Amino acid sequence: MSYQVSVAVVGATGYVGVELVRLLLAHPMVKIRYLCATQSTGKLLSSSYFHISQNYISISVSSFDDIDLDKLDVVFLCLPHGASSEIVKKIHNVVKVIDLSADFRIKDPDIYKQWYGVHYCPDLIKDFVYGLTEIYYEDIQKSSFIACPGCYPTSVLIPLFPLLRLRLVKSNNIIVDAKSGVSGAGRSVKQDNLFCEVYDAIKSYKVSNHRHIPEIEQELCFAACREDINLQFVPNLIPVKRGMMSNIYLELEVGVSLTDVREALLLFYRDSFFVVVDEEKAITTRSVVGTNYCYLGIFPGRLPNTIVIISVIDNLLKGAAGQAVQNFNVMMSYEEKLALSNIPYF
C-alpha cells in the first residue's frame, strides 16, 4: 500500500459530512485520522448514522481544538458559512484545505458581506480556487486550497459555463427553475423541514433571493467575459431525500441551433468522466442519486430560438461531498474517479 494521506473531516455529523466520510472510507489512498463536530463529541459516528458501522471506522468524534494538525495532510471543512473561515485562519499555513462552505466561493468580499455577512479572513479568499472540477481542473491541480461550489451552482454552471464562454446563448435572459431534495436544507431541526411540512408538497423558497445567486452570476460573468449578467433563479424544495434537477431556459444567439448547443457540450465534456449529455437520463434524478454524475439533456423550447436544458445531480455528492473527493483526487494527482465509481441507487 502506498502512502495514505491523513485527513480530518470537520463537520462530520451533518448530511454532507457523513457522505464525505462514507466516500473516504472507500478511498484506498486516505486515512481518516479525525472526525470533528460540535455535537456528539466522544461518540462514534455509528451512534447517529447506523449505516456507518464501527467496523468501518472506530474513531470517536472530537472537538476541532483537540486535534493535532501536524498529523494531517488535508482538512475537509463541512461547516456553515462563517464557521469555516474562522478555522481556515488557524490552519491555512499548515495543511491543505478543501472547504465545502460558501466562505471562499465568492471572490469579492463586499458581495459576500451583502449575502452572508462579515467575512472573517477576506485576505485569504484569493488563495482559494473555485472547485468546479471540470472547469478549473488545472488550477485545482496546482492549489492547496479549494472552495467547493454549492449544489445549485454546480447543476447550473456545468451546462451554462461552456455555452456562455462559446457565445452560443444570450446572457441577458437566463431563467433557472431548480428543485432540491430535503437533505439540501441540512440536518438541523427546522419546522419547515419536518416530515409533515415537506411530505406531499412542493415549496418554492427564497424566490430571487437565494444565496447561491451571486456565486452563479460570478462564474457566468467570468465565462462570458462581462460584468452584467443577472439571472432569474427560483429554488424549490421537493419531498425526496436527495437529488436535484435544474430546468434552465435559454435564448439562442442568432444563427445558433439546438444541434450546435448539443455538439458543443459533447465536445467540451468529451474527456469528463462525470458529465454526460443524455436526454433520457437527464429527465429523472434516479439516474444520478448515489453518484457523482451530472446528466444533461438539451430540448427545444416552445418559443422560437429557445432551448431548455435539464441538469440533474445528487445534491449531496456532485453537489457537495462527491465533488470534494473529486477535487481531492485532482489536487493529489490521483485518478479523478477514485472512490467515486458508484452506480445509482434505486
Curated annotation (Swiss-Prot):
<dbReference type="Pfam" id="PF22698">
    <property type="entry name" value="Semialdhyde_dhC_1"/>
</dbReference>
<protein>
    <recommendedName>
        <fullName>N-acetyl-gamma-glutamyl-phosphate reductase</fullName>
        <ecNumber>1.2.1.38</ecNumber>
    </recommendedName>
</protein>
<keyword id="KW-0963">Cytoplasm</keyword>
<keyword id="KW-0521">NADP</keyword>
<dbReference type="Pfam" id="PF01118">
    <property type="entry name" value="Semialdhyde_dh"/>
</dbReference>
<dbReference type="GO" id="GO:0070401">
    <property type="term" value="F:NADP+ binding"/>
</dbReference>
<keyword id="KW-0560">Oxidoreductase</keyword>
<dbReference type="GO" id="GO:0051287">
    <property type="term" value="F:NAD binding"/>
</dbReference>
<comment type="pathway">
    <text>Amino-acid biosynthesis; L-arginine biosynthesis; N(2)-acetyl-L-ornithine from L-glutamate: step 3/4.</text>
</comment>
<dbReference type="InterPro" id="IPR000534">
    <property type="entry name" value="Semialdehyde_DH_NAD-bd"/>
</dbReference>
<comment type="function">
    <text>Catalyzes the NADPH-dependent reduction of N-acetyl-5-glutamyl phosphate to yield N-acetyl-L-glutamate 5-semialdehyde.</text>
</comment>
<feature type="active site">
    <location>
        <position position="151"/>
    </location>
</feature>
<dbReference type="InterPro" id="IPR000706">
    <property type="entry name" value="AGPR_type-1"/>
</dbReference>
<dbReference type="GO" id="GO:0006526">
    <property type="term" value="P:L-arginine biosynthetic process"/>
</dbReference>
<keyword id="KW-0055">Arginine biosynthesis</keyword>
<dbReference type="GO" id="GO:0005737">
    <property type="term" value="C:cytoplasm"/>
</dbReference>
<dbReference type="InterPro" id="IPR036291">
    <property type="entry name" value="NAD(P)-bd_dom_sf"/>
</dbReference>
<comment type="similarity">
    <text>Belongs to the NAGSA dehydrogenase family. Type 1 subfamily.</text>
</comment>
<dbReference type="GO" id="GO:0003942">
    <property type="term" value="F:N-acetyl-gamma-glutamyl-phosphate reductase activity"/>
</dbReference>
<dbReference type="InterPro" id="IPR023013">
    <property type="entry name" value="AGPR_AS"/>
</dbReference>
<dbReference type="InterPro" id="IPR050085">
    <property type="entry name" value="NAGSA_dehydrogenase"/>
</dbReference>
<keyword id="KW-0028">Amino-acid biosynthesis</keyword>
